[in-house]
């Protein structure tokens, strides 16, 4: 048996018969970008402690061998230890939970690793933009409801603020699509969200759910949580845009003069 090393190979899991490990020196991890305020999977170099753990899979039950696919020069540039996840993660979900528990001063909690101050400030600002907390860091009524949903605060705000039952059903479909792997190839459909909603609803209507099954299941769970019903009616791009704007209010262009000139989220101007 051969293990192509992934983070699974860093656990204490023992697989009988494994005598060799091939380590690419890479891993996929979810990294939060403070500039875009979005999280994305990135392929990054592992640290030396991760490499040591991966190597250990080859010798759990007998002598084995580990093939490392990098040079000594590359190894000299590797970090000795992985960064704590809290230093790279989106802190908004964590801070919302902390405030929901009644703690307004996050830095006073006994953290093993204190969340970085710049990221705490950004996360707090995002939660205020979403209406989840006040300027005094107290939780709002809608913030309490957001904290009860098992999803990112952005997604929770979108579902809870949808203005009608039909829009609530659409918000649940959008939430499921955002959280799961895109079932359509980008070359096939670009980045059109309304097209994906249409395909999902067609699949449900025809009872040909196929590759949409996981997304449909998540949407159904969210609909149950917010007490709304599934819908397979036609959807408009405008409705999708309105709901996405509820989740990402800081991404909406702001009018600068009231006559057609706008400031974009990246600081550029448009008209």
Which sequence ranges carry the predicted segments?
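Conserved segment of the helicase C-terminal RecA-like domain
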Residues: 20, 26-78, 94
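Conserved helicase motor
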Residues: 6-10
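Short glycine-rich loop/turn motifs that provide flexible caps or phosphate-binding loops at active sites
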Residues: 11, 16, 24, 55-58, ...
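The conserved phosphate-sensing helix
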Residues: 15, 60-66, 106, 120-121
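Alpha-helical architecture
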Residues: 5, 21, 54-55, 138
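Second RecA-like catalytic domain
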Residues: 22, 27-30, 70-271
């Amino acid at each position: 048996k051969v293990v192509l090393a992934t983070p699974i190979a860093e656990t204490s899991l023992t697989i009988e018969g494994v005598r060799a490990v091939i380590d690419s020196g890479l891993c996929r991890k979810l990294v939060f970008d403070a500039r875009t305020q979005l999280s994305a999977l990135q392929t990054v170099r592992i640290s030396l402690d991760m490499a040591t753990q991966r190597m250990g899979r080859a010798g759990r039950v007998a002598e084995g061998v580990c093939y490392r696919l990098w040079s000594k020069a590359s190894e000299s540039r590797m970090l000795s230890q992985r960064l704590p996840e809290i230093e790279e993660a989106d802190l908004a979900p964590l801070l919302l939970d902390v405030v929901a528990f009644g703690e307004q001063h996050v830095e006073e909690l006994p953290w093993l690793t204190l969340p970085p101050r710049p990221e705490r400030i950004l996360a707090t600002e995002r939660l205020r933009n979403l209406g989840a907390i006040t300027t005094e860091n107290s939780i709002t009524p809608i913030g309490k409801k957001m904290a009860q949903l098992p999803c990112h605060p952005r997604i929770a705000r979108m579902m809870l603020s949808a203005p009608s039952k039909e829009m609530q059903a659409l918000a649940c479909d959008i939430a499921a699509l955002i959280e799961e792997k895109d079932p359509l190839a980008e070359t096939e459909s670009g980045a059109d969200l309304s097209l994906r909603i249409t395909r999902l609803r067609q699949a449900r209507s025809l009872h040909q759910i196929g590759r949409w099954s996981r997304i449909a299941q998540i949407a159904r769970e969210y609909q149950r949580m917010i007490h709304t019903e599934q819908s397979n009616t036609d959807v408009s791009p405008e409705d999708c845009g309105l709901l996405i704007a509820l989740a990402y209010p800081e991404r909406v262009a702001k009018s600068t003069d009231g006559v057609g000139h706008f400031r974009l989220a990246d600081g550029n101007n448009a008209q």
